[in-house]
Curated annotation (Swiss-Prot):
InterPro entries: Methyltransf_25, SAM-dependent_MTases_sf, Trans-aconitate_MeTrfase, Trans_acon_MeTrfase_C. Catalyzes the S-adenosylmethionine monomethyl esterification of trans-aconitate. It catalyses: trans-aconitate + S-adenosyl-L-methionine = (E)-3-(methoxycarbonyl)pent-2-enedioate + S-adenosyl-L-homocysteine. The lineage of its organism: Bacteria, Pseudomonadati, Pseudomonadota, Alphaproteobacteria, Hyphomicrobiales. It is found in: Cytoplasm. Belongs to the methyltransferase superfamily. Tam family. It comes from Rhizobium etli (strain CIAT 652). This is Trans-aconitate 2-methyltransferase. NCBIfam families: PRK01683.1 (NF002463). Its EC number is 2.1.1.144. It is an enzyme of class 2 (transferase). GO terms for biological process: methylation. SUPFAM superfamilies: S-adenosyl-L-methionine-dependent methyltransferases (SSF53335). Signal peptide: none annotated. GO terms for molecular function: trans-aconitate 2-methyltransferase activity.
Length: 256
């Protein structure tokens, strides 16, 4: 499944805010090496550079389209194609930063444990993941998946991502290697122009696996079914806008 940097950046300000909030809690004054894991189009990498300078900062992603966008955005920064499921730093890093990527990897608890080994003493693993499977935006994806002529494809194979573990599970897994762990949730409330705007948002991320699995022949029909459900789930406010509620989990682990 190929990602679209162009679709992703349609709501760049809203998508970048959690990365900014995560970086604000990183307790480092300086660093020699930082890697932006799942860097996407480079918006989060740019934040790291703004705070710490460009030297020693790099990004990696598995998607060629995202990497191309990141290289255009930050031509002086190294961006590498890599699989986060198996990647490990070749030398100790001071910061491993991951904004909205590990929710796609079911075994991310194991990966976090391994990444802690790739940090220098006092180094930081900083992670943010959407925790929104229980929101109407994502419940409607499952409803649409099993409602149309495409439903046989979803009965054979689910594309719903795995729910996140409870905060206690992340703490328990990391505390053996961490001197300090901060874990918190933030719920963002985004005023959107209308229900179609919510659809445009999730077309860049959570809805993509559903559209790909339904197949190109059913793409527009699936989107129409999904939009109808979103219109019912998100009533208009006094100014005609709708409110997208978006919970996210954050964790910052400092290595012993």
């Amino acid at each position: 499944m190929a990602w679209s940097a162009q679709q992703y950046v349609k709501f760049e300000d809203e998508r970048t805010r959690p990365a900014r909030d995560l970086l604000a809690q990183v307790p480092l004054q300086s660093l020699r090496r930082a890697v932006d894991l799942g860097c996407g189009p480079g918006n989060s990498t740019e934040l790291i550079i703004e705070r710490f300078g460009a030297e020693g900062v790099s990004g990696l992603d598995s998607d060629v389209n995202m990497l191309e966008a990141a290289r255009k955005r930050l031509p002086g920064t190294a961006f590498v194609e890599a699989d986060l499921g198996s990647w490990q730093p070749t030398e100790p890093a001071d910061l491993l930063f991951a904004n909205a990527v590990f929710q796609w990897l079911p075994d991310h608890l194991d990966i976090f444990d391994r990444l802690m080994d790739g940090l220098s003493p006092g180094g930081v693993l900083a992670v943010q993941m959407p925790d929104n499977l229980g929101e109407a935006s994502h419940l409607a994806m499952e409803e649409s998946a099993h409602a149309g002529p495409w439903k046989a494809a979803f009965e054979e194979k689910s594309v719903r991502r795995q729910p996140l573990a409870p905060p206690s599970a992340y703490y328990s897994r990391l505390i053996g290697k961490a001197a300090r762990i901060d874990i918190w949730h933030t719920i963002y409330n985004h005023p959107m122009a209308d229900a179609a705007d919510i659809v445009e948002w999730v077309k860049g991320t959570g809805l993509m696996p559903y559209l790909a699995h339904a197949g190109e022949a059913y793409r527009e029909a699936f989107l129409a079914d999904y939009l109808e459900r979103i219109e019912k789930a998100y009533p208009k406010m006094s100014d005609g806008r709708v409110m997208l509620r978006f919970p996210r989990i954050f964790m910052v682990a400092v290595k012993k």
